[in-house]
Amino acid sequence: MPTILILNGPNLNLLGLREPHIYGESTLEDVEKMCHELGKQHNISVKTFQSNHEGQLIDCIHEARNKVDLIVINPAGYTHTSIAIRDALLGVSIPFIEVHISNVHAREKWRNHSYFSDKALACIVGLGAFGYEVAIQHAVRNLFPKLTS
């Protein structure tokens, strides 16, 4: 059974509360529940982790080595600043999909740069919490088709 790690960065624990006009009304718990349910439907194990601390995110990535087949990451504010998280992802050689709830390209100019996009299998932006579902569906159809049918 394939395993996907859903990794969420800083302030995503405030989903549903923080700027709902930008990030929507779904909570992190709602997003994680949806990911677990979708995983069950497709015979995929889903693990979730959120932290506001860069080192904890890096430790989680390191611990995923040889245990996880795909990482779906919303690096949040670290998108534009964390070479360390990028290096951790590249160091463990786990493919990853970058997800952003808002359309970062339609926001402040400094949000346009990502340290992850050039190495990601795919980048999903601006679809709200549905972006996580799209990432899992992409994995089902393109990465794990024989393992999930």
From Swiss-Prot:
| Top-level taxon of origin | Eukaryota
Q: What are its GO biological-process terms?
A: 3,4-dihydroxybenzoate biosynthetic process; quinate catabolic process
Q: Which pathway does it operate in?
A: Aromatic compound metabolism; 3,4-dihydroxybenzoate biosynthesis; 3,4-dihydroxybenzoate from 3-dehydroquinate: step 1/2
Q: Does Lyase appear among the keywords?
A: yes
Please verify whether the record's keywords include Lyase. yes
* Transition state stabilizer, annotated site positions: 18
Q: What are the protein's UniProt keywords?
A: Lyase, Quinate metabolism
**What catalytic activity does the UniProt entry give for this protein?**
3-dehydroquinate = 3-dehydroshikimate + H2O
Q: Which Gene3D superfamilies does the record cross-reference, listed alphabetically?
A: Dehydroquinase, class II
GO MF terms, alphabetically ordered: 3-dehydroquinate dehydratase activity
- Look up the EC number in the record and give it: 4.2.1.10
Please list the residues that bind substrate: 74, 80, 87, 101-102, 111
Q: Which Pfam families match?
A: DHquinase_II (PF01220)
InterPro entries documented for this protein:
DHquinase_II, DHquinase_II_CS, DHquinase_II_sf
The UniProt entry annotates the active site at 23 (proton acceptor), 100 (proton donor)
Kindly state the subunit structure of this protein: Homododecamer. Adopts a ring-like structure, composed of an arrangement of two hexameric rings stacked on top of one another.
Which family would the database say this protein is a member of?
Belongs to the type-II 3-dehydroquinase family.
Functional summary from the UniProt entry: Is involved in the catabolism of quinate. Allows the utilization of quinate as carbon source via the beta-ketoadipate pathway.
Question: What is the protein's given name?
Answer: Catabolic 3-dehydroquinase
Organism per entry: Talaromyces stipitatus (strain ATCC 10500 / CBS 375.48 / QM 6759 / NRRL 1006) (Penicillium stipitatum)
Q: What is the lineage of its organism?
A: Eukaryota, Fungi, Dikarya, Ascomycota, Pezizomycotina
